[in-house]
Amino acid sequence: MNPAKRLTGSALLALAFLSVLWSAVAAAEATAERNQRLVERAFVNWSAGRGSLFDDLLSPTVVWTIRGNGPAAGTYHGREDFLRRAVRPFAQRLATPIVPRVEGIWAREDQVVVRWMGTATARDGAPYRNDYVWIFKMDGQRATRVEAFLDLVPYQDVIDRIALADPSPAAPSGERQVP
């Protein structure tokens, strides 16, 4: 084989390799962008009081881990387990739902990181404010794993300070958004 043909063959092989590599990079970027848009949309809807971030974004089989120390820290297996043991007991102690203010969203491949601040009013009239970082691992259009970082002291203060609301049938059944 003459040198010109060998060089042409090598160049074509390199171009083919770069094309495959570029396609993989483009697919990863497209996935990250799609995931970021899904999470952004869920937070926009939550801020506007539309829908339920937990229903709209979480897989029914999500594994949600709250990092840190305290009774709420730990791993919850499934959306319903998380709602039942962490979200509802907290939401029932609030006079207003938590309103999130997103401070940043970053995505890479199948992970989306959201840094946000939440504010609400507790049933005793005291303000609730907390800073959060949630890391979502996305699969399709649903989060299958979430790691949540927050200051558990103000969260636990609300839990300890305010008795659970009366869960009578007359109480509204809508899901409030919290931790």
PLM regions: where:
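Bacterial N-terminal signal peptides that target proteins for export
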Residues: 2-13
